[in-house]
């Protein structure tokens, strides 16, 4: 489900930005942010997951449910996950002003699409996260030390039952 979130967000943001900017290559890409971006990653908006945490404000339900036979069956309780996504303008220093403009348009996209429908997964919410300069410095240090203009977004995902791997 997380890969569907990041891929859908990248595709929709790329469609939005492509209507404003005529470029042969894609503008938005999901991937890790490298300290020294390679040619494929340079001059793009990069979406990168920087943290995943369990949201407990929704409550943690009991792992049992009532069945049709009035018996109880053990289940996996649903999880709510906070996915932190860094939206960074990874451009060469010569294209700094262009990177700021494209990042600004990316923020407009996020504002206009704060609720995003995922294919066969339901909807997710997107909201900007305010972090201190110290926290921002820590994040960029972990990502390799080179700062790029960026915004941090939070997405809430609901995972109702384990799907792919099943239970042991």
Regions found by a protein language model. Give the residues of each.
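Oligomerization/assembly interface segments of phage tail-like spikes and tubes
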Residues: 75-91, 104, 148-156
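Short, charged, low-complexity patches
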Residues: 2, 6, 78, 99-103
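Small/polar-rich, solvent-exposed N-terminal microdomains that initiate assembly or binding
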Residues: 1-64
């Amino acid at each position: 489900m997380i890969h569907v979130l990041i891929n859908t967000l990248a595709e929709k943001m790329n469609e939005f930005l492509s209507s404003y900017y005529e470029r042969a290559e894609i503008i938005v890409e999901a991937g890790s942010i490298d300290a020294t971006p390679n040619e494929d990653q340079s001059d793009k908006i990069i979406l990168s997951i920087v943290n995943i945490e369990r949201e407990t404000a929704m409550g943690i339900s009991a792992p049992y449910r009532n069945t049709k036979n009035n018996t109880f069956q053990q289940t996996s309780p649903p999880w709510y996950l906070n996915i932190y996504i860094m939206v960074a303008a990874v451009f060469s220093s010569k294209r700094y002003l262009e990177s700021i403009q494209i990042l600004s348009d990316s923020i407009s996209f996020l504002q206009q699409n704060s609720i995003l429908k995922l294919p066969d997964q339901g909807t997710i919410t997107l909201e900007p996260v305010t972090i201190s300069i110290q926290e921002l410095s820590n994040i960029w240090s972990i990502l390799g030390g080179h700062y790029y203009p960026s915004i941090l977004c939070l997405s809430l995902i609901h995972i109702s039952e384990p799907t792919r791997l099943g239970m042991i």
